[in-house]
Amino acid sequence: MASVNIKPLEDKILVQANEAETTTASGLVIPDTAKEKPQEGTVVAVGPGRWDEDGEKRIPLDVAEGDTVIYSKYGGTEIKYNGEEYLILSARDVLAVVSK
């Protein structure tokens, strides 16, 4: 995973999606047009967290750089940076962290 010069704001995270499956369990090749959008990726960068209701301290996020996460299917904004595709998600769009 390469270093990226993108720093998310507040409770946003930058995720690089894992590759979608190209073949089925039975060996059938899935064309690009039929592939499901991946819902799993690696966290590349994390924002500092949003402010609490009083605006006095930041609420830390539950994810960290390097975590593998599962996120909402239609959550986030897709971006392309230096030829790589990323997704900027709100921390609320992250459904789970995958244990290694």
From Swiss-Prot:
It is found in: Cytoplasm. InterPro entries: Chaperonin_GroES, Chaperonin_GroES_sf, Chaprnonin_Cpn10_CS, GroES-like_sf. It comes from the Bacteria. GO terms for cellular component: cytoplasm. The keyword Kinase does not apply. Belongs to the GroES chaperonin family. This is Co-chaperonin GroES.
